[in-house]
A protein has these predicted regions:
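Auxiliary, metal-adjacent structural segments of Zn-dependent hydrolase domains
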Residues: 18-75
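Amphipathic, non-transmembrane alpha-helical scaffold segments
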Residues: 7, 11, 93-97, 101
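N-terminal small/polar-rich segments of proteins
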Residues: 1-21, 28
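Generic detector of short, locally flexible boundary/turn motifs and exposed helical patches
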Residues: 1-3, 36-45, 80-81, 119, ...
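N-terminal start-of-chain detector that recognizes signal peptides
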Residues: 4-9, 44-50, 88
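Active-site scaffold of zinc-dependent metalloenzymes
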Residues: 52-97, 107-126
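Short alpha-helical functional segments enriched in proximate histidine and acidic residues
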Residues: 20, 24, 99, 103-107
Length: 126
């Protein structure tokens, strides 16, 4: 699958998803830059990554009052997501949403356990 198509599907999914989030979470989501990338390797610290990541949150979390001017960013690695989902469009779209919500949870200051407790690893928001 080509990156342009995967980007288009991801963009559609993310726009739909943000619209149905609770208002406070929706407002938080709008403060985060979303970067759709083919795969890890384009970031300055990517040499520390395994290469099979689906997404990554970088920058200050919403709880940090002073982020030193750094912009919070969620990076989604579309080729990894595509391969992870068995190259099925429906599953890919679902996983884009799930991965975004998971990384958004980190922006909100939640650790892995708190993200899981809210169901964000399964695409649900509690």
């Amino acid at each position: 699958m080509d990156f342009e198509t995967l980007s288009s599907w991801a963009d559609e999914e993310l726009k739909s998803l943000v619209k149905i989030l609770p208002a406070d979470v929706q407002a938080a989501a709008k403060k985060v830059v979303i970067s759709l990338e083919e795969q890890p390797g384009q970031g300055s610290d990517d040499d520390t990554l395994e290469g099979d990541e689906l997404g990554l949150f970088e920058g200050p979390c919403a709880l940090d009052e002073d982020g030193d001017g750094e912009v919070p960013r969620i990076r989604l690695f579309l080729m990894n997501l595509w391969e992870w989902t068995g190259e099925e469009e429906h599953d890919y779209r679902d996983e884009v949403g799930t991965t975004f919500l998971h990384e958004l949870g980190h922006y909100l200051g939640w650790d892995e356990d708190e993200v899981a407790d809210r169901g964000l690893e399964h695409g649900f928001f509690i």
